[in-house]
Design a protein with these regions (language model features):
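Primarily recognizes the serine-hydrolase "nucleophile elbow" in alpha/beta-hydrolase
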Residues: 201-245
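Non-catalytic accessory segments of hydrolases
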Residues: 20-176, 200
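Active-site loop->helix "elbow" adjoining a glycine-rich segment at hydrolase catalytic centers
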Residues: 122, 177-181, 209-212
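Bacterial Sec-dependent N-terminal signal peptides
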Residues: 1-21
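Surface-exposed acidic, glycine-flexible loop patches that form ligand/cofactor-binding
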Residues: 105-113, 191-199, 222-225, 319-325
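Alpha/beta-hydrolase active-site loop
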Residues: 98, 171-194, 249-257
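Substrate-access "cap/lid" subdomains that shape
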Residues: 191, 217, 225, 239-351
């Protein structure tokens, strides 16, 4: 009996140091996976699936679930074409239902109040995913920082403005859905991260390339006041050489794209297409399967973020000039000669 009690006494401290694999969030209980002392929670829904009537709308709250939800596999990547050769993903699936985040935490209890890092992937706002191995947060977690990656809508699904879409909103604007997804992800983290051992008042947002562009956009957005404490961006900003498109300019590009898609649909089906179908009704575009819409949009679906009057109310450079951005410490950087190949090739493909 003494030996048994002694064994239990030795085991109790070790059990206290075991990773916390079950966590209760606002939506329900999640079960993660122990990874040699840290816990990984993958595929956590931070918003409702943006499908059907929610296509081209601001993200809506995630749905609650009963029982324990396994969070051991990545959720689907955002819809995208394989346009960058250096991208590998933790899951092969691409889907319009993509609003998931992943958490690597070293915390053993919810009382540790560890610093939190949220990373937004690069990819020109057209490609990329939080499941990419290069963004895995285990190394950061082993240094005592809760590391998070979050997906957001890309391409035509995340940055499509149109007059009919603008009529649907209270602010009479459209587009920027990918940026709004990022806001929703940060808000979810702020609301729930204490359960994972994190400090909601010590959130740092980080990004590279398009992720860095996102960081600058988020800092300039009135929707982000009070959501994060620090920001880091590398190799990208929305405050570049050109001004951001106005709502009217973005809508005009959206109408042109919708018309081109309609014309392609007409050629494939043999039906005649009305001249202004791109200006009239978006029901057909909303009803298209995601794969078909992406194929029809093609390279013309280059993301056009804009001054929508909601996420972005004025040019970010003006917001910063007036000191009205989210006032937090900002670390920015770039890479040595990162633009040299583009300058030499002048946009041409290497041979």
């Amino acid at each position: 009996m003494k030996k048994l009690l002694l064994s239990i006494a030795f085991l109790l401290p070790a059990m206290g140091m075991m990773a916390q694999t079950q966590v209760k969030t606002a939506e329900g209980i999640l079960e993660g996976k122990d990874l040699s002392g840290i816990t990984v929670f993958k595929g956590i829904p931070f918003a409702a699936p943006p499908v059907g009537n929610l296509r081209w709308k601001a993200p809506q709250p995630a749905q609650k679930w009963q029982g324990v939800r396994e969070a051991k596999e990545f959720g689907p990547n955002p819809m995208q074409e394989p346009i960058f050769g250096d991208m590998n993903f933790g899951t092969k699936a691409n889907s319009e239902d993509c609003l998931y985040l992943n958490i690597w935490t070293p915390a053993k209890t919810m009382k540790e109040h560890l610093p939190v890092l949220i990373y937004f992937n690069g990819g020109g706002l057209m490609a990329g995913s939080g499941s990419e191995p290069r963004y895995a947060g285990d190394a950061m977690a082993r240094k005592g920082i809760i590391s998070i990656t979050a997906n957001y809508r890309e391409g035509i699904f995340g940055f499509f403005a149109h007059p009919q879409l603008s009529k649907e909103t209270s602010y009479k604007g459209s587009g920027n859905y990918g940026f709004m997804d990022q806001v929703a992800a940060i808000q979810w983290v702020k609301d729930n991260i204490e359960a994972f051992g994190g400090d909601p008042n010590r959130i740092t947002i980080v990004g590279e390339s398009a992720g860095s562009m996102s960081v600058s956009a988020l800092m300039a957005s009135p929707l982000c006041q009070g959501l994060f404490a620090q920001a880091m961006g590398s190799s990208g900003s929305v405050m570049g050489f050109k001004k951001i498109a106005t709502q009217k300019e973005a809508e005009e590009k959206g109408v042109q794209l919708a018309q081109k898609i309609a014309e392609k649909m007409g050629k494939e089906t043999g039906k005649k297409v009305k001249k202004n179908i791109g200006m009239k009704n978006l029901d057909e575009l909303r009803a298209l399967p995601a794969e078909e819409l992406m194929k029809l949009a093609g390279v013309r679906a280059v993301p056009v973020y804009n001054i929508d009057g909601y996420f972005m109310k004025e040019q970010p450079v003006d917001v910063f000039a007036k000191g009205e951005q989210t006032k937090v410490p900002l670390l920015i950087g770039g890479n040595n000669q990162e633009m040299t190949p583009w300058a030499v090739l002048m946009g041409k493909q290497p041979t």
